[in-house]
Amino acid sequence: MSKTASSRNSLSAQLRRAANTRIEVEGNLALSIANDLLLAYGQSPFNSEAECISFSPRFDGTPDDFRINYLKAEIMSKYDDFSLGIDTEAVAWEKFLAAEAECALTNARLYRPDYSEDFNFSLGESCIHMARRKIAKLIGDVPSVEGMLRHCRFSGGATTTNNRSYGHPSFKFALPQACTPRALKYVLALRASTHFDIRISDISPFNKAVTVPKNSKTDRCIAIEPGWNMFFQLGIGGILRDRLRCWGIDLNDQTINQRRAHEGSVTNNLATVDLSAASDSISLALCELLLPPGWFEVLMDLRSPKGRLPDGSVVTYEKISSMGNGYTFELESLIFASLARSVCEILDLDSSEVTVYGDDIILPSCAVPALREVFKYVGFTTNTKKTFSEGPFRESCGKHYYSGVDVTPFYIRHRIVSPADLILVLNNLYRWATIDGVWDPRAHSVYLKYRKLLPKQLQRNTIPDGYGDGALVGSVLINPFAKNRGWIRYVPVITDHTRDRERAELGSYLYDLFSRCLSESNDGLPLRGPSGCDSADLFAIDQLICRSNPTKISRSTGKFDIQYIACSSRVLAPYGVFQGTKVASLHEA
């Protein structure tokens, strides 16, 4: 082994040992960081854990004053390790059942509208009719089979057959997946028209309703869908995502809403609207009224009509879908956008001013009162704490602005127990305190205080911003652990230590083949039959199989490792030093 390789291995071993130490301090380190930061800015510290999640900011003063006050309201609001005596799971189920009850009332109201004697439509009814026409023009009468197949895929999450640890698509290709009775015809059609091995484990109308952690006040309810249902749901979601671009709505790009939130905070002409429990409030009746019959039938075929709760009880859904369904995000974006555009049209406003990203809605400020009325009629609840139509503050898609100034806070979400946890918090503090490119001296003292809790090697190991949080953000030029190879500089970062997972070879090859088919074919899946593959297509598929590689699956061990990454080119003069007739480059001198 060369001296260079030996040196690198020695440094890696030192850094690895440092990364696997524990941060030992008395009390709650996360709360200590938050309180010291507040004191540095002249704010009163938190007196209790309850205050951390209940403090409300004042929407006045200068941008700098508001930025600090807003940070106090947000920094610990999503922390998940407070001991408040709240049964967060029970709170989540209470909200879940309340949303179902509201959807039932909405279904009854929308299916039996109460027209007046002169048959004048209310604002809500008028918007439904206008939105229906807009949606039909945008998405057509029925979803395209070719379009759906182009977007069909397995996600990386859990299904009713596979738990999260076996969520990778290769496991889903290897194992039979469940489907609902109405989705069975889609699976059988796919089996008859493709070369993939399509197997069904169970035919059941149920999905699995579960909770996942959210914060110290409540959990979040989601639904785990049958595998084949999710496969086709994502196909429908992909079609809707493509069609929404015709309205200037790109669900792959949050920066559109972020830029417009900035504009609204300056001009006050645009409002940001947020909804409470948006995905759990889309009733069946609303979808039937808004969507073309062909589309509504397909959505009904692919949804799970019932859910099984952890206690074994069963709920028959009054909503079209929930968080966890493969088309929920795109469908809610379509519905909110169509209603908002209809409101703007009724008020003689430019409907192209409406942009949507899920339940983050931006539209002209003067349309907000009417939109609230329409949303109330169709069963949605406006989140008044996160809806802003007046004043200098706007928030959308994770960016927050006050009079045009970026006041986006950072969050401490989890307990700090490892150097990696502390590095993440310190990096977020760095980004928040250097928003204008220069360290705020008030925050810098707090940063230096808590950086000392890291092992010395990790204090000196720095990487440029934008390369993740595997090391402290800083100048790579002063990193003593950086290595140069040619013109590339490599720096060590902390990564999760993983081990290869045992996997089914069949599923691995099928997943790789499927991915290649999607990337190399205009039609998505390789089909067969009278209108499917000919001999040339079959030869192409055989070639894909020959080039396929087993998918590598790994799992985290709970420990940390060190990996060198290329972070930048070396900064050297692009010329040499003349020595007579010879030129010696500076990096060789």
UniProtKB/Swiss-Prot annotation:
Q: How is the cofactor bound?
A: Binds 2 Mg(2+) per subunit, Ca(2+) is used in crystallization to prevent RNA polymerase activity.
**Altering K214A: what's the impact?**
Loss of RNA polymerase activity
Which InterPro entries does the annotation name?
A: DNA/RNA_pol_sf, RNA-dir_Rpol_cat_phage, RNArep_beta
Q: Per the record, what is the consequence of mutating K134A?
A: Complete loss of infectivity
Q: What is the effect of changing R132M?
A: Complete loss of infectivity
Substitution effect: F329A: Decreased initiation of RNA polymerase activity
Q: Give the recorded effect for K78A.
A: Loss of RNA polymerase activity
What SUPFAM superfamilies does the record point to?
DNA/RNA polymerases
Which cofactors go with this protein? Answer: Mg(2+)
The source organism is Escherichia virus Qbeta
**A single GO BP:** viral RNA genome replication
- Where is each RdRp catalytic domain found? 259-391
Name the UniProt record assigns to this protein: RNA-directed RNA polymerase subunit beta
* Catalytic activity of the protein: RNA(n) + a ribonucleoside 5'-triphosphate = RNA(n+1) + diphosphate
What EC number(s) has UniProt assigned to this enzyme?
A: 2.7.7.48
Q: What does this protein do?
A: This is the catalytic subunit of the viral RNA-dependent RNA polymerase complex. This complex is involved in viral RNA replication that produces (+)-stranded genomes via a complementary, (-)-stranded intermediate. Binds RNA cooperatively with the host ribosomal protein S1.
Effect of changing Y411A: reported as: 60% loss of RNA polymerase activity
